Each structure stands twice: as C-alpha cells, then as structure tokens.
C-alpha cells in the first residue's frame, strides 16, 4: 500500500483521492507527502520518498533544489487558489483608493458618545474622502492564473488595465480580456499605473524588485499591492516612499515587523488563499497529481521536473530521472533491448539541467533492468510501475 504523509491539515476532500493509500499525519517512511506551509528544510527524507505535493502555488518552504538532485518531484497547484487571491486583490483596490480602514478605526473611537455619534460622523467623515477605482489604471505584473483573473475582473469594474509578463504563454494570452493592454516592460507599467499589483514567484531575479529605483518610476500617489511574497519589496524603500507620498498606500499579504504600524501600510495576515473553496481546490489538485505520478508516472504541474504525461501502452512503465546530457536515450533503449523487451511507447523531456523519461515496455522487466539503467552515469532515479 502506498504511504502518504500529510504535514499540515489538508481539506478532507483529499481523503477520497487517497482512499486506497495509507494516508495521515503519522505515516512513516512515506512514498509521497502532502504539504501546505510546513517548513521542510530540516525534514529527513526517507528512502521511499518520490514526490511532494504542495497544496498551493509557492514552494519556498520546500528545498526544491535538493529534492531535484534526489529525483523527488515537487508539485504545486497553480490556479487552484486564483479566484480567492483575485477577490482579495479586488478588495485591496478599494482599500487602497478609499480610506476605509482608517475610517473604521476612527469610528471605533466614538464608542460612548451616545446620541452624538451621528453628528460626529457627519463632521469627521471629510477626513476620509477617497477616490474611485473606475477609470483609473491598474498595472498587473505577472500574467499567470492569478494575474489574468485580476486583470479581467478589474477591467470589468471599469479600470484601464495594463499588464506585463515576459513569459506570457499563448494559452494565457487568449484568456485575457481584449481590453487589457500587454506591454513589453515593467517600466511602462510603472509609469502609467495608479495601482500596481504583482503576481510573480520569488526568485533571485524578482527579490527586491520593488526598490527605491523602481518605485521612483511610479506615478506620485500610486498604490502598490503585493500578495505574492514579502521579499519582492524592499521594506525600507517602501516606507520611505510612503513617508514622502510617492506611494499613497502599500498593501501586502505578508506582514513584517518593519511594516506593521507604518502609516498607510496595510498588512493583511496572509489571507490570500484562506478560503474553504481555495483550500478544497488546492487539496484536490495536489492529491490527484500526486496519485497520478505514483501510480502512472505522469508529471503535471511540477516545479522541478518537466511536464510529461501519457496513457500507459505496455505491460509496465519504466520511469527515469536523469541529468539533461547527451546520449542518455540511446543508453536507455540499449538496456531495454538487451533485456529482451520491446518498447511500446517512449517520451523524454527536459527542464533546465534535469530530464525525465518514460518507457512503456511489452512485459514486466526483471529487477536487473532497473539496476542496469540506474548504473548509467547521469541517472538519478529509476522506478518501474
């Protein structure tokens, strides 16, 4: 029986997907792991572990590079929480344009004023006048599942939307509203946007992308929304921009000690995907991908290995994780041929320095074949299903 360990509370909808597995939070030496936010840097990897499924988009809590070297596939669930995050961003657009949070805090100070509350409200409300988002320009950095959803929703609310994504796929481009203008550079977005929202992963290239230099390119009084990762923004630069009025608001789903309590900084306690619907969607998607890989060797939505899936066409499937170097395929086919097997179907794809190969054969191979392939220089892991 397949052993699946969950490191966090996972939606019970995943239970049905794992009904034929030993699934729970006390499982030892697992074949697969389900995780949300648990830090895995110090997790001791057992000899059976072949995959980790993150019920969410970000994988910063998982040592992806180390797992890649070990042939452990890391999955995520892009788009499963897109609607939840989109709705939070739309909420934050209103919070950024109108001084709603300040006004709510002020109203709380009127407790105990009795019948005078109404008059005090009418007298004091002018301090909290804000602008509408209709007709304003929203800049969207990153046009993946969430960025597209935000762009389309904002356009439907009457905003002018400008987006930028150097990696925009044809499929994603077709999902964008025709009213959304795509430009080639972030700088073009910064210069025209009244609001800027970012939806990109945290990488060495994106860390600190919102700094003094980039904020200086923005319109005076712009609102910056960051629901992706706190490290995308230089907190000191943001605070300086808020103090001088270059930024009217900074709204983030990732509070930090520096930002908490800063005037015009709104820190939301990481609520982007915190809806029952998003948690269900992420859990189901992660569970299905994990089971499909364990049972069929198919890889869908992996952050460290290439997407490769195909229906089984033989009596057995040989799955090989290997370095992306020359002459690997020839050595695999030679080993299969030497074992007296016919190849019914074969596919190999690469992602950076690593690659993945599936070989469907006409009969179940003897254990020696897996050992022969594993001994080839550059092979990381071999599995026969």
Language-model features: where?
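An N-terminal-biased, well-structured beta-alpha scaffold segment characteristic
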Residues: 1-77, 191, 211-213, 217, ...
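Rossmann-like adenosine-cofactor binding region
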Residues: 38-43, 166-258, 274
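Phosphate-binding beta-alpha-beta segment of Rossmann-like dinucleotide-binding domains, i.e.
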Residues: 78-137, 301-302
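Oxidoreductase and adenylate-handling cofactor-binding alpha/beta cores
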Residues: 86-105, 152-159, 284-298, 333-337
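Glycine-rich Rossmann-fold phosphate-binding loop(s) that bind the pyrophosphate
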Residues: 143-144
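N-terminal Rossmann-fold NAD(P) dinucleotide-binding loop
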Residues: 147-148
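Rossmann-like dinucleotide-binding domain for NAD(H)/NADP(H)
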Residues: 212, 220-312, 321-323, 356, ...
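A conserved regulatory-domain signal marking ACT and ACT-like small-molecule sensing domains
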Residues: 300, 304-385
